[in-house]
Each structure stands twice: as C-alpha cells, then as structure tokens.
Amino acid sequence: MKHGKNFTLGEYVIIKKPELVKVGNNVRIADFCRISSGGDGKYTFEMGDCSSLAAGVKVWLSSNDYVNELVTHSIPEVKEIQGNVRLGKYTGVGTNSVIMPGNDIPEGVSIGALSFVPSNYKFEPWTVYAGRPIRPIKKRNKENVIKTLRKAGYLKD
C-alpha cells in the first residue's frame, strides 16, 4: 500500500491486495474497515488528501450481481460487477457504510453513516449523501471546509 504523510490505519482493518491501494496525505482508515479486491484483483482503490473512512466501512471492488442461476462466489462462472473505487480530496464516508464497485466519488463528498453506495453512482462534488441507497441531502460549504483544514494545519496556503 502506498500512502502519503500523516496516514492513520485503525485496528482490525482488512485490505486485500494492499499493492492496489493508494492513499494521499492526512488520510484515516478507521477500525474494522475492509477493502476487498475480489475478482481477478486488478482493480484499484484510491483516497485523496484529507479523506477518511469511519469505523466499519466496507469497500468492494468486486461483487456478484445475484441475478443469475449461480449466486455463489465459489463458482468462477458467476457474473461479477467489478471496478475501481476512488475517493477525491476532502471526502468522508460514515460508519458502517458500504461502497460497491465502480465508484468515482468526487472532491468534497460526504457520505452519512450506514449508507449504501450502489455501483457506478453519479455524484455531485461538495454534496452530502445518505441512505440505503444513497441520495443527496444537502450541499457542503467548500470554503468553510478548506478554512477549517488550514486552521488545523492540514493544508498550507
């Protein structure tokens, strides 16, 4: 796993194929998170600067579609949904949320606790999302976030 400065990894975190994981500066992956490559293991997970996964977040880079006759991961012929997952700068994912394959989460997005992010969801930057499945709740104030990070010493002018 490649990581930037001030990276914090919680306890009991499971990262399958850490060589496919890249995180930026000032990033936290809290306790009990799981990042699972599955499938053929070629898909990547990236976290931008000042982003975080709260406790218990699950990130899947591969999953079964569960709509055909063979609905078990032990059979290789099962159709899988696979894709990279990327979290942009200043993003946060709340406790026990689930992120499915193929998501590009843009700068400033915040995902509330216990949320479910379906594959290939279309996000708007600087927006708060929550729910099962997620939906937009409200906009975030980019200037206030940046100001707070600067004041805390995480960003330089």
Residue ranges of model-derived segments:
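C-terminal/domain-terminus segments
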Residues: 104-120, 125-130
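Generic hydrophobic, helix-prone segments enriched in Leu/Val/Ile
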Residues: 1, 61, 144-148
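Acidic/histidine-enriched, glycine/proline-rich intrinsically disordered or flexible terminal extensions
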Residues: 145-157
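Flexible, glycine/small-residue-enriched loop-and-beta-strand segment within the central core
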Residues: 11-104, 120, 132-133, 139-140
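Glycine-rich, phosphate-binding/catalytic loops in enzymes
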Residues: 25-26, 45, 109, 128-129, ...
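Conserved beta-strand-loop-alpha-helix hinge in the C-terminal portion
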Residues: 122-148
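Extended, small-residue-rich solenoid/repeat segments and analogous flexible loops
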Residues: 1-12, 155-157
